[in-house]
Amino acid sequence: MAEGVVLFGVHKLWELLNRESARLNGIGEQVDGLKRQLGRLQSLLKDADAKKHESERVRNFLEDVRDIVYDAEDIIESFLLNEFRAKEKGIKKHARRLACFLVDRRKFDSDIKGITKKISEVIGGMKSLGIQEIIDGASSMSLQERQREQKEIRQTFANSSESDLVGVEQSVEALAGHLVENDNIQVVSISGMGGIGKTTLARQVFHHDMVQRHFDGFAWVFVSQQFAQKHVWQRIWQELQPQNGDISHMDEHILQGKLFKLLETGRYLVVLDDVWKEEDWDRIKAVFPRKRGWKMLLTSRNEGVGIHADPKSFGFKTRILTPEESWKLCEKIVFHRRDETGTLSEVRVDEDMEAMGKEMVTCCGGLPLAVKVLGGLLATKHTVPEWKRVYDNIGPHLAGRSSLDDNLNSIYRVLSLSYEDLPMCLKHCFLYLAHFPEYYEIHVKRLFNYLAAEGIITSSDDGTTIQDKGEDYLEELARRNMITIDKNYMFLRKKHCQMHDMMREVCLSKAKEENFLEIFKVSTATSAINARSLSKSSRLSVHGGNALQSLGQTINKKVRSLLYFAFEDEFCILESTTPCFRSLPLLRVLDLSRVKFEGGKLPSSIGDLIHLRFLSLHRAWISHLPSSLRNLKLLLYLNLGFNGMVHVPNVLKEMQELRYLQLPMSMHDKTKLELSDLVNLESLMNFSTKYASVMDLLHMTKLRELSLFITDGSSDTLSSSLGQLRSLEVLHLYDRQEPRVAYHGGEIVLNCIHLKELELAIHMPRFPDQYLFHPHLSHIYLWCCSMEEDPIPILERLLHLKSVILTFGAFVGRRMVCSKGGFPQLCFLKLEELEELEEWIVEEGSMPLLRALTICNCRKLKLPGGINYITSLKELTIVGMKWKEKLVPGGEDYYKVQNIPNVQFINCDE
């Protein structure tokens, strides 16, 4: 049995005591006593976790342990913070300082004795219930050692939902044919129960070569149970017209008219994924003309939704997999491994494993989701005894299933087993996903910072960062088919992850079972939280409404995190006198993105939250920050990405534990920030030389990501400052000087020896020679550079480039040439608003791995020859160019694009 959530908390407390042992010197006797009791407690918790489903008293004991651990953390942290603040204030009178010191020590000594006594009582109670000590060496292992061990034993195996399809090939062809060839229908619908593969099937149809060639544009929108009509319309518009920028503030009626007109004028395919009710279609349909070139692919659990949308629609009902198909799918996942080069190889199937596997897949009820999750679980087991343990856990569900409810119970048992098998760090990571609303695209960087703030993931002495560790965790959950990760080949890092709704139900159930999280779905802006329901949960997630205001009605010291998720186009309003912050004094994580503060002032009581590690005010309505922010000494993450002008006091320098800092884009003119003491920063966003000295960067030697605005004459010191940032991997540099200064880009990047992603918006007549760049540079984004010489001969010799974007006057010359053998790794290329470009030559053998090409508003550019040489090209997007007639079937240049599966024309008819 993998370790439980409570045991993880005990490990964290153990780590805290070890890490701060030097600062706790002088009261070591009490601390040592606490550590001894923690050691005894750890040896009991494995057995207790295994028996928690059998006994309510055991569950109560585990809850007591969780509360004791939290209390101990708070006591230790508060003591250390008080000591630090006393030293910082520099109390002049020695006697007064000594008196304060002795009082604090006596209180701390007494508090630790109380904690130790409580643990002793819990241990006695557990033993009276027959809980056994399990001493296997694991309990004494540090978190870093456990994480290292987990990483070492990890195996890779085939896990592509697209390649793991079984038994649907003919269905894909039929559905694609109806979308393209049947002019009598507007809607094709796919129906079936949750987890049966509707979305996977729809995705295969969506990417079918025939479909991609037929339509001019494509949109894919998830429709949740509680969707906003305007949000669905916005997503459709953004996907069909991606070049038209932000439309979040567009009036709903104007948006409806624009979308209606757009769908009248071209052949577009819109996918509405997971429409629940017929009434949902009625709310969305106003933007769709009665009969034009648009078609819709719709998925739903309700067969009647498609018929309601279009009585002539073609309806396809998905079927469950046969036992043979289920085993074939499971076998693909378990026994087809990838080596280090990515090559698939088959592993010999043990007869006993095969026999057990064929029985176990019957519990999946023919649902592909459950089969894939079971496969992901079994792929981590490599011996017959390990398989036997999984088999025994599923055993009670292998027989006697005679109803739909029995089948669902067995399916959920399989999904739950995947959770129970996780190592304790991954359990926390998985449970944290329960915070997010249904169908929410979870931004992985944001998730990693939540996890870091709670100590679920930590950086390591070997240079492994929080982001590295977080990506390892998500990859493992994806390998187990518990989540899906959206990997954008344009960029280095993963962008978003999601859960299937059935897996999310398991996540929510486990979070409730562990008292991990309380979710408040507030249906209206005036709805409030019932304070009584806060009694058990250590984490709160508020979905919409104005409920934050009512949190001040009670004090709940158990709450460690509070995340607010606004409805579309909605802001929660917090009064300036809100007692909310004082009511939740032990918060570690506070996300108030898109909260509107009365009078534009963040209450000074924010400074009372001295335990905060994470504070996000992204897109919040704030014009004034209080100086009490200086009290937040433990902050790791601070996001001040506000709307509008803001007053920022010079107190950020005191947050010396910060790893991530996003500054406001616009601050008062007199603002001068001193940031040189922030030596632990790994990400610094929106740094401007208008508000801080570029010399401060010299001290931030751990920076891996930097976005920098130059607004004054500090360009001469820029190169020397950046040269000290030897860990820098991502650099975004923008010149806002008037008049613009010409740069030699090579001086800027010469010493950035680990640079992988570079964005330059600076005046740079000539692109630097390739030898000035780090050889593993992967992504370049150049705009407003006014380069007079063709940069391609240099760029194409950067052998590891995966994406290149040249936009908004990056190049002002007339001719570009991509030569044979150039860009050997390039996957994505975008040419946009290059107004002087007339000729682009693509030689045969150039860009052999290019997957996506976008050409946008290069008005003088002639249709490039040589595109047909790029045989790897899968997506060609052409925006605002007069080439459509030549490139559609029957056009004189159609041969150049006929082998590209997806060719889109946007605004090409004018």
Swiss-Prot record:
Coiled coil located at which positions? 22-60
Q: Which InterPro entries match?
A: Apaf_helical, Disease_R_plants, LRR_dom_sf, LRR_R13L4/SHOC2-like, NB-ARC, P-loop_NTPase, RX-like_CC, Rx_N
What is the disulfide pattern of this chain? none
Q: Mind listing the GO molecular function terms for this protein?
A: ADP binding; ATP binding
Q: Name one GO biological process term.
A: response to other organism
Q: Which keywords belong to this entry?
A: ATP-binding, Coiled coil, Leucine-rich repeat, Nucleotide-binding, Plant defense, Repeat
Q: Which residues form the NB-ARC domain?
A: 169-461
Q: Which Pfam families match?
A: LRR_14, NB-ARC, Rx_N, WH_DRP
What superkingdom heads the lineage? Eukaryota
> Is Zinc-finger tagged as a keyword?
no
* Record has DNA repair as a keyword: no
The entry assigns this protein to a family as follows: Belongs to the disease resistance NB-LRR family. RPP8/HRT subfamily.
Instruction: Tell me what this protein is called.
Output: Inactive disease susceptibility protein LOV1
The scientific name of the source species is: Arabidopsis thaliana
Q: What is the lineage of its organism?
A: Eukaryota, Viridiplantae, Streptophyta, Embryophyta, Tracheophyta
